[in-house]
């Protein structure tokens, strides 16, 4: 019981094995054994037994000897147990040392049967050890801080033997060396599993204390010489020194000259050696490298000459972007990321159409501010929303027109040229500039629109004899695109008078002939009707549904007299084709700008009702199913007969009507 009390000051993870129990695990750093592995690993983790490692080997060899005297056992066991608890307790009492002696005796008894073979050797060594270890060394070892010995001992896993020459353990060195040499067989049978390392391993492993001395160079040269020469020369040297290692005759090979890049030429061995420059020092230092390579330079030199230079131009060129102006401007990131000699052929083909679009975008940048300055605040907001460029629908961006909308380019023209000439119908100069802008950007569409331009030009000249004759006549291809469906108050007043004067009776006659509901004065500004018709004629020849209407309009345009050409054409185009054009315009305008954009078609209805109110009443009963509510709502707006009021009422109802008209008008076109 007193022994247990004496053990109390030790840390709980450091409790040694109780004396009477057989041990399962033995700490490889200290003489303690325990039944729980965690205690032993805590020894490793916290470095609790740093000073006892050398003593553990002695204890395995000496203390566990059955034939040693009790005094002989006490003294060597006193040494390890005096040293081992140093990290835990710096001051050890005599009682604790006695308890440690008893623990050592128990271990010696348990290991008795293992040591019968090693009796004579171990007895000799124990006697010498007892003589050579005075108690002063034990006391000094107790007071010694563990960190000093830990610095000397690089690792707990290195077996301690003849190479432990430093510290206060210098006294024990001859005995330890004799122990490790003489009873080698007995040592390995007695030692624990952690120390059962063969002596060849200990002798072969060079300790870190002597790492800076001649032991390491001794092993390096044999290792290099043991390698087969071709293996060493082929893998190690040519990768680094191949340009210098060839004879001059082989370096003048055509193979090297073919693959050598201008960056490599200074490294070719022939100019260096011919000019008297010394060869690189890494080759001069180990002399065996030349000896190894001289043996095998007949066969592998082709491989050195062939493969190494091919790598250099690949990296030198692969990391540089070839100085193609188009690549350096825009696609430097792409060309750097991609292998430069595989892709650059495909880059120009991708870039040239983009450059064409960039030219168009630059032209638009030059020309689009001219109408934008003339537009009011609402048209400015629309100019942000819509893209005034030919070839792109309102849903596409000016840089990248959406390819799905190429079949609806006429719709795109509607919304776009809405923008370019929206509020410019009252001023001829404005329309002229916008016509120029459109002509520049719509050369791709002129072939389609040119054949329809005479009809529209005649209509424009007759309806706008004072305003547009000088503008529309010189620009045949531009005239259909000059159309503004956004009516100003002045234009409305002009065409209210015109429609009231001559179009009322004629329009009634034509309404009887043809489909009533869209018998609207789409020609708010005289161009709006043509805008729908022009864009429709660009669109509908591609669509089978309304192509006969298209031809019918041409014939009527040609045979109608000049004075009534505007209004008769406005009524004739109110057939199914006009329904299609209204659907087209509403689809285009509703997608491009939600607030104002349905002007072209809703102004048709509203202005039809304001200009010719007597036409509204025959129109409502004859309205088609798709336009019933539009007619009903249109009758509500017939009360405002003044052009200014009609415009304000249109603005009020546009946001409401555009969505419903969009849905109503879209259905027959989709079906």
Swiss-Prot record:
GO biological process, one term: epidermis development
Keywords for the protein's UniProt record, in alphabetical order: Activator, Differentiation, Metal-binding, Nucleus, Transcription, Transcription regulation, Zinc, Zinc-finger
GO cellular component, one term: nucleus
UniProt zinc finger (CCHC-type) residues: 25-51
Feature: compositional bias, Polar residues: 67-78, 402-412
Predominant subcellular localization, coarse grouping: nucleus
Highest taxon of the lineage: Eukaryota
GO MF annotation terms: DNA-binding transcription activator activity, RNA polymerase II-specific; promoter-specific chromatin binding; RNA polymerase II cis-regulatory region sequence-specific DNA binding; zinc ion binding
Sites where the protein binds Zn(2+): 27, 30, 43, 49
Function recorded in the entry: Transcription factor involved in epidermis differentiation.
Residue ranges of the region described as Disordered: 66-87, 366-433, 592-671
Compartment(s) where it occurs, according to its Swiss-Prot or TrEMBL record: Nucleus
Protein name as annotated: Zinc finger protein 750
């Amino acid at each position: 019981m007193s022994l247990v009390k004496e053990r109390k000051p030790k840390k709980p993870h450091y409790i040694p094995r109780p004396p009477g129990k057989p041990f399962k695990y033995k700490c490889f750093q200290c003489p303690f054994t325990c039944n729980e592995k965690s205690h032993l690993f805590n020894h490793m983790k916290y470095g609790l037994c740093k000073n006892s490692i050398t003593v553990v080997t002695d204890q395995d060899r000496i203390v566990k000897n059955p034939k040693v005297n009790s005094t002989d056992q006490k003294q060597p066991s006193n040494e390890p147990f005096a040293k081992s608890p140093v990290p835990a307790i710096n001051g050890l009492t005599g009682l604790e040392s006695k308890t440690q002696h008893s623990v050592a005796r128990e271990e010696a008894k348990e290991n008795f049967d293992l040591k019968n073979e090693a009796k004579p050797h171990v007895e000799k060594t124990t006697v010498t050890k007892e003589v050579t270890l005075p108690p002063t060394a034990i006391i000094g070892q107790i007071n010694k801080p563990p960190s000093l010995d830990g610095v000397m001992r690089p690792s707990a896993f290195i077996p301690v033997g003849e190479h432990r020459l430093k510290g206060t353990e210098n006294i024990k060195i001859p005995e330890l060396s004799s122990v490790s040499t003489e009873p080698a067989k007995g040592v390995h049978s007695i030692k624990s599993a952690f120390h059962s390392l063969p002596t060849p391993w200990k002798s072969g492993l060079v300790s870190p204390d002597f790492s800076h001395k001649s032991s390491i160079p001794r092993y390096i040269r044999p290792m290099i010489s043991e390698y087969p020469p071709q293996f060493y020369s082929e893998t190690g040297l040519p990768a680094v020194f191949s340009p210098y290692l060839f004879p001059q005759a082989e370096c003048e090979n055509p193979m090297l000259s073919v693959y050598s890049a201008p960056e490599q030429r200074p490294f070719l061995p022939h100019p260096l050696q011919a000019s008297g420059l010394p060869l690189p020092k890494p080759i001069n230092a180990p002399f065996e490298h030349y000896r190894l390579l001289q043996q095998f330079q007949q066969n592998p030199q082709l491989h050195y000459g062939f493969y190494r230079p091919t790598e250099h131009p690949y990296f030198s060129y692969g990391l540089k972007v070839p100085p193609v102006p188009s690549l350096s401007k825009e696609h430097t990131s792409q060309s750097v990321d991609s292998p430069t000699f595989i892709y650059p052929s495909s880059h120009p083909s991708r870039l040239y159409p983009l450059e064409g679009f960039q030219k168009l975008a630059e032209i638009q940048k030059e020309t689009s501010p001219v109408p934008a300055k003339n537009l009011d605040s609402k048209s400015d907001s629309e100019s942000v929303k819509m893209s005034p460029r030919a070839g792109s629908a309102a849903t596409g961006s000016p840089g990248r027109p959406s390819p799905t909308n190429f079949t609806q380019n006429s719709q795109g023209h509607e919304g776009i040229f809405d923008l370019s000439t929206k509020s410019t119908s009252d001023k001829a100069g404005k329309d002229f500039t916008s016509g120029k802008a459109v002509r520049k950007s719509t050369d791709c569409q002129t072939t389609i629109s040119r054949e329809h331009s005479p009809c529209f030009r005649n209509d424009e000249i007759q309806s706008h004899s004072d305003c547009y004759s000088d503008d529309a006549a010189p620009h045949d291809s531009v005239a259909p695109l000059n159309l503004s469906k956004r009516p100003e108050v002045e234009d409305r007043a002009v065409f209210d008078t015109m429609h009231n004067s001559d179009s009322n009776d004629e329009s009634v006659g034509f309404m009887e002939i043809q489909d009533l509901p869209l018998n609207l004065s789409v020609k708010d500004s005289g161009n709006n009707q043509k805008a729908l018709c022009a864009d429709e004629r660009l669109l509908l020849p591609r669509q089978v549904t309304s192509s006969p209407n298209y031809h019918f309009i041409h014939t009527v345009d040609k045979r109608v007299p000049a004075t009534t050409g505007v209004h008769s054409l406005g009524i004739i185009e109110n057939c199914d084709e006009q329904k299609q054009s209204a659907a087209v315009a509403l689809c285009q305008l509703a997608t491009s700008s939600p607030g104002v954009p349905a002007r072209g078609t809703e102004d048709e209805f509203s202005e039809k009702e304001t200009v010719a109110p007597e036409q509204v009443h025959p129109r409502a009963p004859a309205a088609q199913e798709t336009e019933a509510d539009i007619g009903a709502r249109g009758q509500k707006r017939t009360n405002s007969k003044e052009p200014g009021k009609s415009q304000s009422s249109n603005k009020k109802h546009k946001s409401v009507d555009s969505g419903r008209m969009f849905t109503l008008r879209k259905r027959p076109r989709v079906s």
